[in-house]
């Protein structure tokens, strides 16, 4: 009975350990997806394309699994919070950028929920992206 209990306990511990490593791997790959979308956005430098790249980065990261979706949310929220602070420092309490930030967050959520990021793709954006 002790052997059976020990085997069950060990399998539970190893199972949780395995899930944790899987989550971390997904988060790491999801963070790379977010970085790739950001790099592509900077490279494209295409007018009105930021929502597309927000949605695409979140979509790609979330496709990795729960760890990727978590990383996408953390990175997206951090980016928007930093942008809010810099907007406040530049423009004071004018509300500048609030609507854009809300639209960015909507695009982020769109992508994370598995919806097609091409919904936000602007006409004329090169096929490379």
UniProtKB/Swiss-Prot annotation:
It is found in: Secreted. Residues 90-103 have a biased composition (Basic and acidic residues). Residues 1-18 form the signal peptide. The keyword Secreted applies. GO terms for cellular component: extracellular region. Residues 90-129 are annotated as: Disordered. Gene3D superfamilies: Serum amyloid A protein (1.10.132.110). Coiled coil: none annotated. It holds the Pfam family SAA. Disulfide bonds: none annotated. Apolipoprotein of the HDL complex. Major acute phase reactant. Belongs to the SAA family. This is Serum amyloid A-2 protein. It comes from Sus scrofa.
């Amino acid at each position: 009975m002790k052997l059976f209990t020990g085997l069950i306990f060990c399998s539970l511990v190893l199972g949780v350990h395995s899930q944790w490593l899987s989550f971390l791997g997904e988060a790491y790959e999801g963070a790379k997806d977010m970085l790739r979308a950001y790099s592509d956005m900077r490279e494209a430098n295409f007018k009105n394309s930021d929502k597309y790249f927000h949605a695409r980065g979140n979509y790609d990261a979330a496709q990795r699994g729960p760890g990727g979706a978590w990383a996408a949310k953390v990175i997206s929220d951090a980016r928007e919070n930093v942008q809010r602070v810099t907007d406040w420092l530049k423009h004071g309490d004018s509300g500048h950028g609030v609507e854009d930030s809300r639209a960015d967050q909507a695009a982020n959520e769109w992508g994370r929920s598995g919806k097609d990021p091409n919904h936000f793709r602007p006409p004329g954006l090169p096929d490379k992206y």
